[in-house]
Every structure is written in C-alpha cells, then in structure tokens.
Amino acid sequence: MKKLNYLLIVSFIFILNLLISKSQVLIDVTAKCELIDSLSPCKDNLNYTHIYLPTGYTQAAISAQITPLFQQASILPTDCQSNLKNLLCISSYMECNENIPNISPSFPLPSYPCNKYCEKVKDVCSAYMAILGPYVNCSAVQNGNEFFPHTGTDYDLTAYGGSANEEIQCSGPNLASNSTSAPIKFCPSPLIWVDSDTINNKRAYQETTPNCVLPCPTNVYTEKEYKTKFYSEAILFSFSTACSFYLIFTFGVFPNKYTNRNWIIVYLGITAICLAISYAVQEARYGGGDWRCTSDPGRYKSSEDGTCILGGFFFQIGGLGTILFLSLYSFDMFLTMNMMTNKYFIQTSVGMWALIIFYALLPIKHYESSIASAGCWLSNEDNMFWQYFCFYVPSYVATFFLGVFIITSIYKVFKMTVMFKSIKDKRILLLNIRSIIFLIAIMFCVSFSTMYPLYVTYNGDDFSKSVEVYVTCLYANIPNGNEVCPQIVFPQFSLRYMNAITMAIIGIVGLIGLGIDPHILQIYRESIRFKFLLGLVGIQWGTNSPQPLKQGSTTDSSSGSGSGNGSNSGNNRENRKSQRKSRGVSIGMKKINLSASSESSNNLLNQSTPGNLNINESISSIDTSNNNNNNNNNNNNNNNNNNNNNNNNNNNNNNNNNNNNNNNNNNNNNNNYSNNNNNNNNNNNNIERINSDNV
C-alpha cells in the first residue's frame, strides 16, 4: 500500500500543478468573482469568501478536481496533509480582488499564494520531498511573475488606464482549519466510499485508499479464465463426490467385517465430501449475483454471515481432515508392512476427529472472503495467527509424518522386491506399490493446496500491484476512469487453477488408489447388507456362485474333459455327446473310482507275491504306497500324490470311456510313472519297499 500511496501523491501533485498553471492568466478582462460555494471542500480552509474564476472555469469544475485530491491527502501524516491541503486550496481558489482603481473596463485580479505557505509544506513534508520536490517548487516563475510571491504581485495596467505597478497582496489560508474537518465523501467510480468505523467493525472490505473500497464483486481474472475454472470445478467436484460416496459404501456399509484400513478410507471419503459441500455453498446463488457479496456495498462476506461460517467450517474440516487421515493411512500401511497393528486405533481416530472439529470451531469468528478468494476461509488478520495456528502448523506436522512413512514404505517395498523375485504371485508387492503411488499423488495434491495460500500471502506485492495501477488510473482519469482504465488482472492464473483442481480431485484420486481392487468384488459378493438390498428389488446375488473345492478333491472340469477327449478317439459321435452331457457326473465318478482303485491296490499289497505281481498292479501299488507314504512324508511326496492321483483319474476315465484301451492305459501309467520318477527320486525306493512287504 505504501507504493500506492506514493503513486497517488505523484498524481495529486501533478493535478495540483495542472490546476495552478491553467488558472494563471495574468490579465483576464472577462474573469469574475464569485462567492465560494458552501459545499466546496476548501470552504473552511480559506480566510476569504470571494474567489477568482478565470474565463471558462466554474466552481463545480474546480471542486470535481479538488475533491479526490483532498481525499488522497489523507494518506499523509496529519501535519503534512493539513498544510498540503491549505496550499492546494489557496492555489485553486484564489482570492478575488475587485474595484481596481482607474481601469476600464472593470475586471478583477487574483491574489497569488504566499511563498511562506509553500515553504511550510516543504518543511513539514520533508520525508516525502523525494517525490514532492519536482512539483512543490516555491521559487517557480510564470509569465515573469513569481508563482509564490513573498508579499504580492505587481500588475501593469497602463493598457487599461491604470497604474504601471498595481500591487496585489498575496493570500493565505485559514490557519484555524486543520485536518479534523469533515472528510470528503468522494471516491472515483467504481470505488465506494465507506466510513472508517464501518470498515473497522465489519471487516471484509477491500480498502484501496482511505475510505475508498473496491466494489463487490471485483473481477481479477478474465471472463474466459473464470468460466474455465468454474466448469472444471463443477465437473470434478461432482465426480469426486460420487467417488467418495462409493468409498464410504464399499468400505463402511457393505463389508461384513471391518479393518483399520476400511475405517480410514471411510474417513477420507467424508473429508472429501466436506470439501465438496464447501464448494457447493460458495457456488450457490442466493437471490442472484456473487455469493461472496453482501447487501452492504463493497463488503465481502465474513463471520457475520451464516453462509460464510458454514462454508469455512466445511472447508476447514475437509482440508485439514484429509491431510491428517492421509498421515494415519500411511502410518497404518507402515505397520502392516512390518507385521504390526495399531492397538489404539479407536483412540487415535476419536482424537483426530476431535482435533479437526476443534480447529474448525475455534476460528469461527475469523472466517471471511476477499477479492482473491473463491469462498470463505481463515482471515489473515493478527499477522496470520489463525491461519498458522488452526491450519498450517497441524497440516505441516501431519505432512511431515506422511512423508516419513511414505519414504519408509518405499524402502520397505524395495526390499520386498528381492523376496518376490522367485515367486510368481506378486500381487501383494503390486498392491503395496500402488498404495505408495496413491500416497505420493495425494500428497502432491495436499501439499500444493496448502502451499498456494502462503504463496499468495508472501507474494502479495505482485497481486496488489494490479490493484494499484487500476486505482491510480481511476484517479488520473476522473470522472471517466471506469471507462478508460483496464480491468484488474491478477498474475499466475495457472497456479490458481491448479490449486482448485488439486482440491477437486481428492475423491477421484481416492477411488483410483483405494477403490479399484479385485477384493472389492468379494466384498459385494459376501455382503449380507448388499444382498438384502438387492433382494428388496428381486435380484438374487451369489446364490449360484461356485464354491471352493475341498483339499483332496479332483481336478477341475477342464482337466477332466481333456482326459476324456484323449481316451474317446475311437468312439462314435453318440458316445461323445453322452460324455459331454455327463461331464458333470464324471467328476463324481472319478472320485468313486479313485477310492475303488485305492482299495484294490491295498488288497494287492496284502495278498500278492513277487511271482504274480505284474507291471500294472505294481504301478497301482506304487500309487497307493505313495499316497500312504505322503501321509508320513508330506514334504517329499506331495508332487507324487498329485501325479499318481492324476494317473488313477486317467485310468478311471479310460475305464469308464473305453474298456478296450488297456494298452494305452498301461502306456499312460508307465509315462506317468516315469514322470513320478523325474519329480521324486524316491519311487524306486518305494518299489523295493513294496516288494519287501509282499515277500
């Protein structure tokens, strides 16, 4: 604002000099004297009542130029402004001297301002002489006469029948006048004049010069930029709200069981909805016009207005809550990676919610909007105390821990990559990587949203410069400044736009990072509440879903069908159709045949001798022996059990489908037997042990 003050002083003195130069016509026979207007801003500053008006000038024209300058003199210290006002008045409203003797025709002459009053201004305004100096020249000369004479001005009136040295005494102001006179209620359009008490008591006025405030609303971006921002926010906040409700229902309503992670995701969904509510409040049009404006001309909404409190409260919960719960999510992920749990999760959650609500209610009398804001938030009064105490400090502490846990988790995942190199199923690793990417993305959004207000605050000169140029133009172009002065345009719209986007996509980022997972489908399939809701509209969900096979069951249908097709190469078409129809039954038959084969093999083990043991019987015995040995040696013979069970299944299928394929079965058994030897070298030992038992 100091820079603006200097610019206005320059403008003030420039117009003062312009007024003086235009009013100095040494002899103007058509000039006239008039009684000073009672509404003139200089009425109390003069010790005379009749003023000199050169040809073409009126009191109204002089008053129109003097009034804004009088107003701007209020920016100076009291002693300086009072003397500067006096000098302005005696230079613009010169004392009129009538009844000059011996001249014809009769005409009045002006009294120039005395030099001592100019010197007084230089003395009391010495701190501003670096700016005022070129314009307050007390030794200036115009048309051969001193502009600020020490005693008076000599006029040569011989051409009019008068004296060659007619002296007219210099004039001075009313020294009894001071700066406590009634203020001039004038501001150039579109600025609005507001008394000081109202500005101080109600706040939220954008004061440019003393008592002159910007109108509400004042556009600080182009129409295209406003539309781009509005439509982007409307679309993204709508999607973000839908995504947030999806997260709340998926992780907070439908699950049959709840984890700490579920609750944190629900918390994040709630805070994202709070941000959307604050946006909805600020974009509402109550009776038309801009939401930020009140019925008081020039005043933006503050804590005196209920809607401002509502919007600021939800924005504080949404912004601060998102940051705190993201740090809690990163902490929970850190514990999970280290095989630990948060035993005090309930207490932590309650404490965080209490802290968020506390920080939203504490500054309830300090929410306000402004020319640069989209809605209501914490004011920057008291050296930004409320912003730092209620938002920046807790959010930056939470962001610090969020960063620590993210870095620690990245290191943990890096170590996990070594462990998962030899494992085909890397889903756990991929899920952890996705969670980290989500946290990094959401951390960027949060960090940008919290840093942008600080950027605006600490670069305020760049933004106020646009206002200064605009206001200076208004004063320099009275009364047409509003028509000729360009609109205020704040710099860095791209940053402002990015700030709006990062807040609007919180729910969308949450959906991508947390709500798209194969596990989600399982939640809905198993959800009792979801099935109940579907049942209300006549939809059955999950009743015919496949059940998991028990351990020891046969292979899937695709394996069974493959064996059947291989053994039916010689069958006719009817047999193939019959088998396809009975494919579901063959699975059960395999299990029965497998049991029968095992029983038959046990009989062979108990009754046979080495002399009557053939290769097929030996293979069956080996299969059964392997199954028995697997009960005692799970670690060594699991693969043999699976292979031998498959052999039995293949044999059973072959027996069911074609009784004439014994040779093929033997070949298959031999091949499978060879595979068993390749998978487990203990088969030979099993054969020897079987022969020994038979002996």
Curated annotation (Swiss-Prot):
Disulphides: 33-96, 42-89, 80-125, 114-170, 118-138
Q: Where is the composition biased (Polar residues)?
A: 545-556, 609-625
| Keywords, sorted A to Z | Coiled coil, Disulfide bond, Glycoprotein, Membrane, Receptor, Signal, Transmembrane, Transmembrane helix
Sequence ranges on the Cytoplasmic membrane side: 255-262, 329-343, 409-435, 522-695
Q: Which residues form a coiled coil?
A: 653-691
Cleavable signal peptide: 1-23
Q: Where is this region: Disordered?
A: 545-695
Organism domain of life: Eukaryota
Specify the glycosylation sites in chain numbering.
Answer: 47, 137, 178
**Topological relation to the membrane, as annotated:** Multi-pass membrane protein
Q: Does the keyword Transmembrane helix apply?
A: yes
* InterPro entries per the UniProt record, alphabetical: Frizzled_dom, Frizzled_dom_sf, GPCR_Fz/Smo-like
The cellular component terms of Gene Ontology attached to this UniProt record, alphabetical and capped at eight, are:
membrane
SUPFAM superfamilies reported for this sequence = Family A G protein-coupled receptor-like, Frizzled cysteine-rich domain
Q: Which residues cross the membrane?
A: 234-254, 263-283, 308-328, 344-364, 388-408, 436-456, 501-521
Name the predominant localization.
Answer: membrane
Q: Where in the cell is it found?
A: Membrane
| Record's compositionally biased regions (Low complexity) | 593-608, 626-686
Family affiliation: Belongs to the G-protein coupled receptor Fz/Smo family.
Q: What is this protein called?
A: Frizzled and smoothened-like protein O
User: Upper lineage ranks?
Assistant: Eukaryota, Amoebozoa, Evosea, Eumycetozoa, Dictyostelia
Gene name of the encoded protein:
fslO
